[in-house]
């Protein structure tokens, strides 16, 4: 009972001081002992959590044999390529996107690029037209664009023939 009393005491303190809490949970190695969610129905920006969802979806697609870390971005989005794509663009593989080492060399679709309209409505076409000054796989550069492209690769698998099927036709 002491744990529940201390937990409620903390809850009252947090509430009375308007602490910006999302949730609090106390558990041992086997189960949740006490838990409280604040503003559970309030929308929130989850930022980098999206990357976790994307890599999970990639893993599931790989498990089904629909996707490989070796798949090339330019092959998947070949209908979005400009007439003269950057030679390094054709070297970018899914594994580079997941490790944020695509070679774009800067954080795309972030910071000032977050304003409405940048890259929209066709992110794939926008990204395929970007210069790739760094050898893919050689340098880390945090970029939302890498995650967006990886997520779009997965989306294509479940909304149209798979990239492998398209490349065989």
Residue ranges, per PLM feature:
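Basic/polar N-terminal segments that are highly enriched at the extreme N-terminus
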Residues: 1-2
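A short, well-structured edge-of-sheet supersecondary motif
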Residues: 6-40, 69
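Active-site-proximal loop and beta-strand segments within enzyme catalytic domains
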Residues: 12-17, 43-50, 59-142
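Flexible, glycine-rich phosphate/dinucleotide-binding loops
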Residues: 33, 82, 166
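Well-ordered alpha-helical segments within folded domains of soluble proteins
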Residues: 53-56, 145-153
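Conserved small/polar residues in nucleotide/adenosyl-binding loops
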Residues: 158-165
